């Protein structure tokens, strides 16, 4: 299980820094409905603008009012990556995967840094992996699955829809048979799991751990 600490080891922005960067970009977007929303919400942002929850909900609403819905993921893609997205931690994780020491990888991060490091270290031929971010992609794969349970925004190529706001996050985790919950519980109940870059403060992750304990 990979968390934000893995990505931040490679100079990825923290969650708060990402939100603040996106806030600046959204302020530059223009259309009449969005402009009206920004004017109405300006006071709330002045009072509570440093709250991750408020910023996340503001961004979700603002993008829903914009004509081009894919712009949100494209903005995240712009802010995620720099010229040197690697670290000793990521390279070591890639080598562990190379030696077939893991059955699957579950990541909560939007980025594809693990895949990039596998490719950059010349391990693509020895590690046949599949990046999975949708239910339909699970069926029939005979490769190492890398599950992006909150969506994936690769450095290059088309961007995915991601779980960004707290509202979307809670909605997904309240759906017991959502593919991401099923895959996480499968790993927690049938495999020895290692958690890297996670603070374990996420209540939904702790809930899954409690559920796995009961199931075992």
Q: Where do the language-model regions lie?
A:
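Conserved catalytic-core helix/loop/strand module for nucleotide-ribose chemistry
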Residues: 1-216
């Amino acid at each position: 299980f990979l968390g934000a600490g893995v990505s931040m080891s490679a100079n990825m922005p923290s969650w708060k820094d990402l939100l603040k960067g996106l806030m600046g970009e959204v302020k530059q977007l223009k259309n009449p409905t969005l402009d009206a929303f920004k004017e109405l919400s300006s006071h709330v942002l002045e009072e509570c603008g440093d709250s991750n929850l408020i910023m996340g909900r503001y961004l979700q609403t603002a993008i829903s009012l914009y004509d081009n819905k894919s712009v949100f993921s494209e903005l995240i893609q712009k802010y995620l990556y720099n010229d040197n997205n690697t670290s000793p931690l990521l390279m070591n994780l890639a080598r562990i995967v190379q030696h077939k020491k893991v059955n699957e990888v579950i990541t909560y991060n939007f980025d594809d840094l693990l895949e990039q490091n596998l490719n950059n270290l010349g391990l693509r031929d020895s590690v046949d992996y599949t990046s999975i971010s949708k239910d339909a992609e699970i069926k029939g794969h005979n490769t190492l699955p890398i599950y992006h349970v909150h969506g994936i925004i690769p450095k290059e190529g088309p961007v995915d829809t991601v779980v960004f706001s707290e509202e979307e996050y809670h909605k997904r985790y309240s759906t017991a048979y959502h593919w991401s919950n099923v895959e996480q519980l499968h790993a927690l109940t049938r495999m020895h799991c290692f958690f890297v870059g996670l603070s374990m403060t996420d209540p939904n992750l702790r809930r899954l751990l409690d559920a796995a304990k009961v199931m075992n």
